[in-house]
Design a protein with these regions (language model features):
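Phosphate-binding and adjacent anionic-ligand microenvironments
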Residues: 1-103, 109-139
């Protein structure tokens, strides 16, 4: 209860807008499920390193993912790349099972989530070391 009150205080501190109006200002997002394609424990970190190099290469060449360029790359525990419009994709090795972790979020559309997924999946396929996904994209 205390945390809920503190959150309301934070959200309304010095603001004269109604909370319902503030909610309308939040951008809609489209997310993928957290997907986990199979990858052997002994290979998953090398696969992620390979994906990092390929995504950095895409950025350096100015190539597009869908209709967007890659604007930012974070390589802590895998790779998170952010597109010009703020949408992003994440690829990392699972810490507790033989798989990778793939997550995607778009501020534009579910179609863009699919474009980002197709980009990531193509890179993973090129390694020849990634198997079946535990789940796939749904609408």
């Amino acid at each position: 209860l205390k945390s809920a009150c503190l959150m309301l205080q934070y959200l309304t501190n010095g603001i004269t807008k109604k909370l319902s109006d503030k909610k309308l200002e939040i951008k809609k997002t489209f997310q993928s499920p957290t997907m986990a394609p199979f990858c052997e424990d002994g290979e998953k970190y090398q696969v992620v390193d390979s994906i990092i190099k390929k995504i950095k290469n895409t950025k350096e060449k100015g190539e597009k993912v869908g209709s967007q360029t890659i604007e930012k790359i974070i390589t802590i525990n895998g790779i998170r790349f952010e597109l010009l419009n703020g949408s992003w994709g994440l690829v990392r090795a699972s810490s507790n099972k033989p798989s990778l972790v793939i997550v995607i979020e778009s501020y534009e559309s579910h179609d863009e989530v699919e474009l980002i997924f197709n980009y990531i999946n193509k890179l993973l396929d090129q390694t020849g070391k990634v198997g079946k996904y535990d789940q796939t994209l749904t609408r």
